[in-house]
Amino acid sequence: GSPKYCHLPADPGPC
């Protein structure tokens, strides 16, 4: 996942 898109379930980031 990308930190920029960590709010998206499809790309969970280190949030």
Curated annotation (Swiss-Prot):
Cell location: Secreted
BPTI/Kunitz inhibitor domain span: 6-15
GO CC, alphabetical: extracellular region
UniProt keyword list: Disulfide bond, Protease inhibitor, Secreted, Serine protease inhibitor, Toxin
Keyword Disulfide bond recorded: yes
Record carries keyword Ribonucleoprotein: no
Domain of life: Eukaryota
GO molecular function: serine-type endopeptidase inhibitor activity; toxin activity
Tissues showing expression: Expressed by the venom gland.
Family the entry assigns: Belongs to the venom Kunitz-type family.
Stated role: Snake venom serine protease inhibitor.
Protein name: Protease inhibitor
